C-alpha cells in the first residue's frame, strides 16, 4: 500500500460514520448498474465486492438475488458492517488473498474504490481479480475521469483522500490487458454534477456468461 493510500484509509477510518450517512442513498446510476449485473448473472451468483464502505451496494445486490462477499481496506467500515451482523473481511486487493474456498467468483463489484489505487498498481489489482473470477464472469468498476492524480479535502468526508484519474481509452486498455474483454465504458456525472465518472463493465476472458 502506498503512503497516499495509507493516508486515504486513515481519513476514511476517522470519518467512517459521516461517510456512511452522506452516501446512504443509492444513486440511480449505481442502481441501474447493479440491476444489469443481476440480470446477467441470475439469482445466487457470487460477487466479490471490493470496497464495501457502509454496505449500501451490497444490500441492494442481495435484494436483487446476488450473494455478496463484503470486503474493505478500511478497518472502521469492516467493524461497522460486522456490528450490523454482516460478514466482512479486511482486505487489500493489491496484496491479500482474494480467493474463496467455494471457488471462483461469478463477478467483481468495485464501485468508487479502485480510484484510490495508484496508476502503476491498478494492472496488478485487475490481474488478481481476474485470477479469482470464473471464465465468463463479470467485472463492474467505476473511476473518476480526468488526468493525473491528486488530493481532495472536500466531498463526502473532510479528510485528505488521494485519487487517480483516468481517461476512458486508458482505463479500457488497462482492463483489457488484465484478461478482461468485451469492455463497455459509460460516462455519468457525480451527485454534485461537477465530476464525470467512468463506469466500466467487462467479461473475464471475453467470454459471455
Which residues does each PLM region occupy?
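Short, glycine-/aromatic-enriched active-site segment of Class I SAM-dependent methyltransferases
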Residues: 144-162
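Short alpha-helix
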Residues: 162-178
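Class I SAM-dependent methyltransferase SAM/SAH-binding core
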Residues: 48, 54-97
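A short acidic, Gly/Pro-enriched loop at the edge of an enzyme's catalytic core
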Residues: 96-108
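Conserved beta-strand signature within the Rossmann-like core of class I S-adenosyl-L-methionine
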Residues: 136-143
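A short glycine-rich, Lys/Arg-flanked "PGG" loop and its adjoining helix->strand segment in the class I
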Residues: 123-135
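Conserved class I S-adenosyl-L-methionine
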Residues: 1-42, 147, 189
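A short SAM/SAH-binding and catalytic strip from SAM-dependent methyltransferases
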Residues: 106-121
